[in-house]
Amino acid sequence: MTTETGIPEVVKASSETMSADGKPEKPNPSMFPKRQKRDTPKEYSYLRCEYKLPHKNHRQCHMQRKAEEKFCAQHVLLQKDSYAGRERVVCPVDPGHTVWADELQQHMYKCNKVKERMQKEREGWHRDDMNISNPEAKPCVGKKSDITVDYAKWIPVVEAAFKDVEEVPVEILNHEKGLAKRMTEVQNKKHALQQASLIAHMEKTGLLKSSSRILEFGAGRAELSRYINYAICAERQQDDKTAANYLFIDRAMPRMKMDGKLVKDTKDDFPEQPLPLIKRLKMDIKDLMLDGVPVEGPYDANLIVSKHLCGCATDLTLQCLLNSAVFTKEARPAALVIALCCRQICNVQMFPKAGIEWLQERGFDDDGFAALTRMTSWVLCGERPKKEPVEGEQTEAADNETPAPVGHPSGLPAEARKVIGLKCRRLLDQGRLHALRKEGLDARLVQYTEMDISPENVCLIVNK
């Protein structure tokens, strides 16, 4: 029903409702009933596979099935081994799907995994496992529980070896020009503060400039490179017309990438400057032959960066650089600034060989290395701090609270385990330093931010 003005009566009535002080009142929710849930399931215009996907919370498969079958071609093997005399077999290239046995030969020409493999073979920068430094080493199998680690044996070894570890100085810096805009855009400044310090450390290397090639390993969305680009633009001289050169490397292709933001920021805030040149590689660092990657434009230095590159990826990156001309044969200067992370997933097969030897000299065999990586997680194993009560806010009864776990297999309280975990971190980092210095590189560690900003607050800096 509508009024003479054409406004629905319900809406007009709600818009004319005023409170005692003359301000309009919010409309009554009962006047706008919620949309009712569908009583019957959604109907599909095709015969849908009846298989419930266990890894998708038992959601029904969306593939089409034949009228005489319950399942689609992918799941028909769950009902019987063959259909009309035809047998389905697992694809030899990708075990994640099946094909008809009599169509296997044709399938090998159109399988997506086969196409990916052929594409990699055509690329000049892909070599399977070339950056795994210790392929002959015994791989770590699965995740070890705390009970399987002999703490009585390995904690004293950690304490004794820690005497050879260098102190990590605190160097918290700030890059005001490059991150000034960023600081005003975010309410939670934790990431911005870390980025500002890392970029300032890059500037100290002397290679934060438009003529450097910026290589971000484990780039993800390339958020760090976005603000590196902004910092370079903010510091650029007026007569500098060199286009900045970026290479992003990640084995995933994340959504909401910021590659375009680098170009947009330059257009909007620095319209007189040349637009950056960007190339993104989707590949695993373990297979990357860096010297084979084509360069987008001229450059006179290499700056390798990453923020919180996980343990295995850090070691693969270091080996990738040592296998390339960047840190060995090239005359161009090079520097590396990486915020370290996730040492609990370091692997003896990927850790620098000279670093493994350094640890072995201090009593860590393969089991000791596994124990070392396991105990690094103790840095974050302390009890979660209790939330401070807010005035006027109800708090749960004490008898409803879940008590913190007690009786850790190591026999140590949380604070003592945290100290041991930090020492294990430093031992792994010292092994990396030893390996890099053995190659003639200038390598050091710094605490680039406070631990309450990020528990992973150590940065590896390398200069050629």
Swiss-Prot record:
Pfam families: TRM13, zf-TRM13_CCCH, zf-U11-48K. Its main location: cytoplasm. The keyword tRNA processing applies. A zinc finger (CHHC U11-48K-type) spans 88-115. It comes from the Eukaryota. It catalyses: cytidine(4) in tRNA(Pro) + S-adenosyl-L-methionine = 2'-O-methylcytidine(4) in tRNA(Pro) + S-adenosyl-L-homocysteine + H(+); cytidine(4) in tRNA(Gly)(GCC) + S-adenosyl-L-methionine = 2'-O-methylcytidine(4) in tRNA(Gly)(GCC) + S-adenosyl-L-homocysteine + H(+); adenosine(4) in tRNA(His) + S-adenosyl-L-methionine = 2'-O-methyladenosine(4) in tRNA(His) + S-adenosyl-L-homocysteine + H(+). Transmembrane segments: none annotated. The keyword Metal-binding applies. It is an enzyme of class 2 (transferase). Signal peptide: none annotated. GO terms for biological process: tRNA methylation. tRNA methylase which 2'-O-methylates cytidine(4) in tRNA(Pro) and tRNA(Gly)(GCC), and adenosine(4) in tRNA(His). This is tRNA:m(4)X modification enzyme TRM13. It comes from Yarrowia lipolytica (strain CLIB 122 / E 150).
